[in-house]
């Protein structure tokens, strides 16, 4: 039986990575032995290229192809084999981040960049079975990012507002897959809600 793919999405500063760690540490979820991963990948040739691009002024189209190459490698080496072996996979960021973020960075290049980026993935990506969208006002998110230290080029209010709008468009188009979480709520409350829903989903399919 094929495993299921669960993804966590949201703008920078939404708190999703913190929740991802809590999910990984949760003993009730650990019982089911899911595979935990992230995008961009860490410690890989493609993932390192993406991280370097984020920290530089790489051309937006070149940047998209680096992200997409990392996604393809991630699918081939980890996600697809794990799912084929019946493992459930939980990923901190996945393809929806690319649609939402590069759907903004490429606005000057294409009439409908979000759809164009999605079309690049048609036929070969794996669509998640469940996606949590950590929704939050960009002002709050940027304030959180500032507390972490130096900001990246993606952590600007106007930019993140456009990314947030793209995420909400994606969620509205696929309500059966997306669970929108109010990430402005206290961190502990958000963690408990998401962990509860992840556990219920895994128990239901096991």
Curated annotation (Swiss-Prot):
Keywords: ATP-binding, Kinase, Nucleotide biosynthesis, Nucleotide-binding, Transferase. ATP binds at residues 10-17. It catalyses: dTMP + ATP = dTDP + ADP. InterPro entries: P-loop_NTPase (IPR027417), Thymidylate_kin-like_dom (IPR039430), Thymidylate_kinase (IPR018094). GO terms for cellular component: cytoplasm. The keyword Ribosomal protein does not apply. One of its GO terms (molecular function) is dTMP kinase activity. It is an enzyme of class 2 (transferase). GO terms for biological process: dTDP biosynthetic process; dTTP biosynthetic process; dUDP biosynthetic process. Its EC number is 2.7.4.9. PANTHER family: THYMIDYLATE KINASE (PTHR10344), UMP-CMP KINASE 2, MITOCHONDRIAL (PTHR10344:SF4). Belongs to the thymidylate kinase family. NCBIfam families: DTMP_kinase. This is Probable thymidylate kinase. It comes from Methanosarcina mazei (strain ATCC BAA-159 / DSM 3647 / Goe1 / Go1 / JCM 11833 / OCM 88) (Methanosarcina frisia).
